[in-house]
Amino acid sequence: IKKYALISVFDKSNLKFLCNNLIKHNIGFVSTGSTCDKIRDLGFKCQEISKLTKVKEMLDGRIKSLNHKVHASILYKRTSLSHQKSFKKLNFPKIDYVIVNLYPFKKTQDSTLDKNKIIDMIDIGGPAMLRSAAKNFESVTTICSPTDYKKFINNLNINKGITSIKFRKLMASKIFEHTSKYDSLISTWLKEKKLTKKIKLKYGENP
């Protein structure tokens, strides 16, 4: 069965380097919206998730990858016959690599007071995919930052198209640390007390 990388990235830096090296190992691409468009613009074939799931993106992009087929492809145990049978019925590509970076919540929070813009940067589908892949680290490799692309490709090259279990565990630990910090930033923002004007004072007066 051909292996696929699910790529969904807000930060599209070094995407050409990543794709160029993945195709050398006969790894296909599955992606969402703008990332899929970017991969195609770079000259690579890419299957769009919404076409594979037969469920269109909805709610202005809030629902893209939250689909049971996507997560089954990431989470199923490769060593379990019952899991293999269930997955086969879905007729969905086998995802062995999940490369996702999250919406820039902190950067947006620091650059605007617009509540709606900040809320839009609370990523839901991205963390879900990363955590699914990290849970199944025995079979699936997960990457959350372009800074890890070179390490990832080097590990693939050394091991002739697969990553080592040591590398997968290391990346999985990074995912849970990363998503935990991301959630903490959101939680802190939600708890912040907004300053409001209580008394209108004349210039020079003290309350």
Model regions: which residues?
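N-terminal glycine-/serine-/threonine-rich phosphate-binding loop
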Residues: 1-29, 34-52
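Glycine-rich nucleotide/cofactor/substrate-binding loop typically near the N-terminus or early
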Residues: 34-105
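Active-site loops and adjacent core secondary-structure elements that bind or stabilize anionic groups
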Residues: 151-155, 163-207
